[in-house]
């Protein structure tokens, strides 16, 4: 499983953990996802890993995208849709994480491996949203070539490093009420203004709004 400090938890995860808002149990989620993958016949390209905080669906990028592309292949959309059905009846927080190998060459579309992995993550998120997953409980992360599990020294290792991971948190995503703001606190007044400066100059001027 992917290694992150504190199990890869964000502030959202920390909040839900502190409040004990555990989502759907991993055993049930894993069964549903395994059935969806089996029905799609794509077990060769997808595997599932679990750690104390995350249930991770690792999807090989070769199944989802053409080389150096972030557009989901039409043939792969039904696979994502099946996974979405398995995730539709749970309330767990979901992250979509993008990874690449170290062979990407910047082109006119993507500047670097972070850019490519970010766009691929967003593309998968959008497919999940189209399939009915609430966008408010999803987020994307881009790791590019810098958080690989396998060595990039071999073709086999590079192939395994090119992936998108749909990671399901152990904790539920419960939206907190939005706070209504009618006026800015005095010490934050600068945030309502505009920042301006001259090209080539290190001087910055904050122009406060009325």
Question: What do these predicted regions represent?
Answer:
Residues 74-75, 112-113, 183:
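Glycine-rich, phosphate-binding/catalytic loops in enzymes
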Residues 45-49, 54-60, 64, 79, ...:
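Soluble periplasmic/extracytoplasmic beta-strand elements of cell-envelope proteins
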Residues 58-66, 85-116, 139-151:
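Short, surface-exposed beta-strand segments enriched in small/polar/acidic residues
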Residues 115-210:
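Periplasmic OmpA/Pal-like peptidoglycan-binding modules at the C-termini of bacterial envelope proteins
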Residues 1-63, 174-210:
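Juxtamembrane linker/hinge segments adjacent to a transmembrane helix in small membrane proteins
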Residues 26-43, 68-98, 102, 125-129, ...:
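Periplasmic peptidoglycan-binding/anchoring modules of Gram-negative envelope and division proteins
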Residues 17-24, 52-81, 103-109:
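Short, solvent-exposed beta-strand/turn patches at coil↔beta or beta↔helix junctions
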């Amino acid at each position: 499983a992917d290694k992150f400090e504190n199990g890869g938890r964000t502030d959202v995860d920390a909040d839900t953990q502190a409040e004990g808002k555990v989502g759907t149990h991993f055993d049930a989620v894993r069964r549903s996802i395994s059935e969806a993958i089996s029905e799609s016949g794509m077990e060769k390209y997808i595997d599932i890993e679990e750690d104390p905080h995350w249930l991770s669906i690792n999807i090989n990028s070769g199944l989802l995208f053409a080389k150096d592309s972030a557009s989901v292949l039409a043939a792969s959309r039904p696979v994502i849709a099946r996974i979405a059905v398995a995730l539709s009846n749970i309330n767990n927080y979901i992250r979509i994480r993008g990874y690449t190998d170290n062979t990407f060459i910047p082109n006119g579309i993507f500047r670097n491996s972070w850019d490519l992995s970010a766009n691929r993550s967003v593309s998968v998120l959008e497919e999940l949203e189209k399939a009915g997953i609430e966008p408010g409980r999803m987020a994307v992360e881009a790791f590019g070539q810098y958080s690989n599990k396998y060595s990039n020294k071999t073709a086999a290792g590079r192939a395994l490093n090119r992936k998108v991971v749909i990671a399901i948190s152990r904790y539920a995503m419960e939206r907190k009420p939005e706070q209504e703001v009618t006026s800015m606190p005095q010490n934050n007044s600068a945030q309502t203004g505009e920042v301006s400066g001259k090209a080539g100059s290190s001087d910055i001027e904050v122009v406060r709004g009325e």
